[in-house]
């Protein structure tokens, strides 16, 4: 993937940044693509760095992701909760699966979606192979993970655990307004006047 470069004028001349480094200077983190361990390590490092720089300023995470690894996503969420800085989450495009959990885990009152974004909640995906006992162990772990994710979504949205169990039984797509009504986000960011 080609990453654009931004040229800035400084007192010492010109300075070139890749676009993500430039956004990081403004305390903006981009969470895009599949949630995996490599992405999680990068996001966590950025969160820790920005919090160490100034824990009184908000950090914004823009989310456009189909989801991915539950353990990687929970590591990001735990770090969001661990740091002192408030974390603003903004869905743009798609916040699906684990990405919807991260969207809802932003600081209450600071969870947003752009008007045409989509939020998807569902049960975790998994598979198992091997001997019967190994399949049973894997199935129990998937059920435990589903219960944990539904409890997190219930806590973040204000919905009951039972409602989350029912609503995540199958893919549940939501518009930005539906995600707001459900409690996954606090508001919809409207277009700035031109």
UniProtKB/Swiss-Prot annotation:
GO biological process: protein quality control for misfolded or incompletely synthesized proteins
MF annotations from Gene Ontology: ATP-dependent peptidase activity; ATPase binding; serine-type endopeptidase activity
InterPro entries: ClpP, ClpP/crotonase-like_dom_sf, ClpP/TepA, ClpP_His_AS, ClpP_Ser_AS
Compartments where found: Cytoplasm
Enzyme Commission (EC) number: 3.4.21.92
Highest taxon above the source species: Bacteria
Primary localisation category: cytoplasm
Gene3D superfamilies in the record: 2-enoyl-CoA Hydratase, Chain A, domain 1
Top-rank EC class of the record's enzyme: hydrolase
Active site: 97, 122
Any Pfam family hit: CLP_protease
Reaction(s) catalysed by this chain's protein: Hydrolysis of proteins to small peptides in the presence of ATP and magnesium. alpha-casein is the usual test substrate. In the absence of ATP, only oligopeptides shorter than five residues are hydrolyzed (such as succinyl-Leu-Tyr-|-NHMec, and Leu-Tyr-Leu-|-Tyr-Trp, in which cleavage of the -Tyr-|-Leu- and -Tyr-|-Trp bonds also occurs)
Keywords, ordered alphabetically: Cytoplasm, Hydrolase, Protease, Serine protease
Cellular component terms (Gene Ontology): cytoplasm; endopeptidase Clp complex
Sequence similarity: Belongs to the peptidase S14 family.
Function summary: Cleaves peptides in various proteins in a process that requires ATP hydrolysis. Has a chymotrypsin-like activity. Plays a major role in the degradation of misfolded proteins.
Subunit structure: Fourteen ClpP subunits assemble into 2 heptameric rings which stack back to back to give a disk-like structure with a central cavity, resembling the structure of eukaryotic proteasomes.
NCBIfam families: clpP, PRK00277.1, PRK12553.1
Protein name (Swiss-Prot/TrEMBL): ATP-dependent Clp protease proteolytic subunit
Organism: Latilactobacillus sakei subsp. sakei (strain 23K) (Lactobacillus sakei subsp. sakei)
Gene name, Swiss-Prot/TrEMBL: clpP
